[in-house]
Design a protein with these regions (language model features):
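Charge-dense, helix-prone N-terminal extensions
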Residues: 1-86
């Protein structure tokens, strides 16, 4: 179940390609992805979807997966989940 509110996004809502969903599920990262703010979820998908070459899509997907595993990065920038903020 996803109760993320996407209504406040200023950019169009991006569809999740099946290969992204499959990768998230295979690695057990779907919940980590859904735990990110709506803008991050949407930005990741937009960034991956904009890639022209399959190799670039795969590279971007891997970066997203690596950042979700770490939990403290978003697009190579520091990220502190709300549950860890003081």
């Amino acid at each position: 179940m996803n109760d993320t509110d996407f209504s406040g996004l200023s950019r169009p809502l991006q569809p999740m390609p099946q290969f992204v969903k499959d990768a998230l599920l295979e690695r057990g990262l779907f919940d980590a992805y859904r735990g990110r703010p709506a803008y991050q979820q949407n930005d990741y998908l937009s960034w991956i979807n904009r890639a022209k070459r399959p190799q670039t899509k795969e590279k971007r997907l891997q970066q997203m997966l690596d950042e979700l595993v770490r939990g403290d990065l978003y697009m190579k920038m520091d990220y502190t989940p709300p549950s860890n903020r003081a």
